[in-house]
């Protein structure tokens, strides 16, 4: 000890040579986050203020802000496409996990529906141009241009890991993300106000009050000339309200892809970052029992019929409304119960699955898990409020029992489905066996599941029962070493994924296109009061709707990776 003190402190050994160093990201990211927070709070203030008649903020102010934001975001996207990516070594890496084909395909589909909605909006506001501000006609036109440019940008650049113009790219991506969130909030608020006025009209024998109130707010002296009285105007009005769900999903899909791009700015990737999202075209639609797709399609068709019956009967007299609610709750209880059991069975199958876990850094998967867990909170909140209202405040009749069962199954279904999806996303691809800590194990205890494993026989001790396969009989060897149990598990997981996917699609369609049993069933309205219950539903339900569509995207990925 004394000799060491006399010699003085030893020099630390030189650090090993590392790869290219990443630039310090905290400054640019912090600036972009602060920019997004401030812009989002401003947009949220105007949008929420414009939803109330007593607040002196008009919808024209909201349209003006959204139009300005879309113009600025479009200018930055054009700068990125025409200048940033054309710099030398601007995109040295591309993230294979980001922007899978089904996510970009869904973005294009929802973008097309958003363009149709913009056409309907333009036609609707042009029907009484003399009573409207010019910004109401300019806004859908600018939005159409923004959707076209942004969709192309995300299609070609979703996988980019940019290494030039870092601060500008961080701020531009975050501002574009904020623009999409502001558009989403405006659409959600507009649809919620429309639903609230529809409920008020059905309970007060008044006419459709929302359009009239908006028109008189814009031009109090306009008189009857501002009424949407023509058949074409009515078609435009109903059309763009029914297309709002697609606009909402487009904004959320774009926001998730922009966030992954923001995380990938300045990122260095290893040469083998784990499994890819790209499936083989041969195995994409094979190796299923077809029980899951058939049962899922059956529930989908029945769900559409139930939804149509509900929409037709719920606005009738008391007995027809009660009958519609019983049919609606009964179908949802069956669907939620089956999806809960199927999700639980999928998690049980994973207990016998020997595929290795994928621990590589993956911003896309991290975001998927966070969105699944966060979006489920909205439906959790509605369900717990319903449970309290049913247990504490109503007589126990058939409708109350169905409502309580529906709320409990909704909680269970979200919980077990999230467990199944999250565990599936963290599994490696088929054939990825977990690495053993003892590399030299007896060969008789191994089961090989791919061709590469056959070439590792030389590292094992000689065994008379195993022979080195020749190229001519490799196909026969694969048939010998492939275990039927693993094949059976893969088929079950594919069927489970397809069944859950189809069920989540119909469970998305019902609330997204106007099914509101929360207000038709007066249990919660009587217990909490309409004002409080409307706030709870209008805040939480959009997250529940988004959960369904995001679960569809994740389940499609689970199906491909199974």
From Swiss-Prot:
Q: What is this protein for, i.e. what is its function?
A: Proton-selective ion channel open at neutral pH. Actives at neutral and alkaline extracellular pH, likely participates in some alkali-related physiological activities.
Record organism: Homo sapiens (Human)
Q: What gene name is listed for this protein?
A: OTOP2
Tell me the superkingdom of the source: Eukaryota
Which PANTHER family does this chain map to? PROTON CHANNEL OTOP, PROTON CHANNEL OTOP2
Q: Where in the cell is it found?
A: Cell membrane
User: What family does the Swiss-Prot or TrEMBL record give for this protein?
Assistant: Belongs to the otopetrin family.
Record-annotated membrane-spanning stretches:
30-50, 62-82, 100-120, 137-157, 169-189, 241-261, 289-309, 324-344, 371-391, 402-422, 495-515, 527-547
Give GO terms: molecular function aspect only.
proton channel activity
Q: Name one GO cellular component term.
A: membrane
Question: What protein name does the entry list?
Answer: Proton channel OTOP2
Q: Which UniProt keywords apply?
A: Cell membrane, Hydrogen ion transport, Ion channel, Ion transport, Membrane, Transmembrane, Transmembrane helix, Transport
Region Disordered, as annotated, extends over 1-20
Catalytic activity line of the entry? H(+)(in) = H(+)(out)
List the taxonomic lineage.
Eukaryota, Metazoa, Chordata, Craniata, Vertebrata
Question: Which stretch is the leader sequence?
Answer: none
Give the principal location in a single coarse category: membrane
Q: How is this protein positioned relative to the membrane?
A: Multi-pass membrane protein
UniProt-listed GO biological process terms: proton transmembrane transport
Q: How is its activity regulated?
A: Actives at neutral and alkaline extracellular pH, acid extracellular pH appears to inhibit the channel. Insensitive to activation by Zn(2+).
């Amino acid at each position: 000890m004394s000799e060491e003190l006399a010699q003085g402190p030893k020099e630390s050994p030189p650090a090993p040579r590392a790869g290219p160093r990443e630039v310090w990201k905290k400054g640019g990211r912090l600036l972009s986050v602060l920019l997004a927070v401030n812009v989002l709070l401003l947009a949220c203030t105007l949008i929420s203020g414009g939803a109330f008649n007593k607040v002196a903020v008009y919808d024209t102010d909201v349209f003006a802000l959204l139009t300005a934001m879309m113009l600025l975001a479009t200018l930055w996207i054009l700068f990125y496409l025409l200048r940033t990516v054309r710099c030398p070594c601007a995109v040295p890496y591309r993230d294979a996990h980001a922007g899978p084909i089904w996510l970009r395909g869904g973005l294009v589909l929802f973008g097309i529906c958003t363009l149709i909605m913009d056409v309907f909006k333009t036609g609707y506001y042009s029907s009484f141009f003399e009573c409207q501000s010019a910004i109401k006609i300019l806004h859908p036109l600018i939005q159409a241009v923004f959707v076209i440019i942004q969709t192309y940008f995300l299609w070609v650049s979703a996988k980019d890991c940019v290494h030039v113009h870092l601060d500008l790219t961080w701020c531009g991506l975050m501002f574009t993300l904020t623009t999409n969130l502001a558009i989403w909030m405006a659409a959600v608020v507009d649809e919620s106000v429309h639903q609230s006025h529809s409920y008020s009209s059905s309970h007060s024998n008044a006419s459709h009050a929302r359009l009239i109130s908006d028109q008189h707010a814009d031009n109090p002296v306009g008189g009857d000339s501002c009424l949407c009285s023509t058949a074409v105007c009515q078609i435009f009005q109903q059309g763009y309200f029914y297309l709002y769900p697609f606009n909402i999903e487009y904004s959320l899909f774009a926001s998730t892809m922009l966030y992954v791009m923001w995380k990938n700015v300045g990122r260095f990737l290893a040469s083998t970052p784990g499994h890819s999202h790209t499936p083989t075209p041969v195995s994409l639609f094979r190796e299923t029992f077809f029980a899951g797709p058939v049962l899922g399609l059956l529930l989908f068709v029945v769900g559409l019929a139930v939804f149509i019956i509900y929409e037709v009967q719920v606005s009738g007299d008391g007995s027809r409304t009660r009958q519609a609610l019983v049919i609606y709750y009964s179908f949802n209880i069956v669907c939620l119960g089956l999806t809960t059991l199927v999700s639980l069975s999928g998690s049980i199958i994973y207990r016998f699955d020997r595929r290795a876990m994928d621990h590589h850094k993956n911003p896309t998967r991290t975001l998927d898990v966070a969105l699944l867990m966060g979006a489920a909170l909205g439906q959790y909140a509605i369900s717990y409020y319903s449970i309290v209202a049913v247990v504490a405040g109503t007589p126990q009749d058939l409708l109350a029992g169905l409502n309580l069962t529906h709320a409990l199954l909704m909680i269970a279904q979200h919980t077990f489905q999230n467990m199944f999806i999250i565990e599936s996303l963290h599994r490696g691809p088929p054939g990825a066996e977990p690495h053993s800590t003892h590399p030299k194990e007896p060969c008789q205890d191994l089961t090989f599941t791919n061709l590469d494993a056959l070439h590792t026989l030389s590292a094992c001790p000689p065994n008379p029962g195993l022979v080195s396969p020749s190229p001519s009989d490799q196909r026969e060897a694969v048939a010998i070493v492939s275990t039927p149990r693993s094949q059976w598990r893969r088929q079950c997981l594919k069927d489970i994924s397809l069944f859950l996917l189809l069920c989540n699609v119909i469970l998305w369609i019902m609330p997204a296109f106007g099914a509101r049993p929360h207000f038709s069933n007066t249990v919660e309205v009587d217990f909490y009061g309409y004002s409080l219950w409307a706030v709870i539903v209008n805040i939480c339900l959009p997250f529940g709707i988004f959960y369904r569509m995001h679960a569809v995207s994740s389940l499609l990925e689970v199906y491909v990776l199974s």
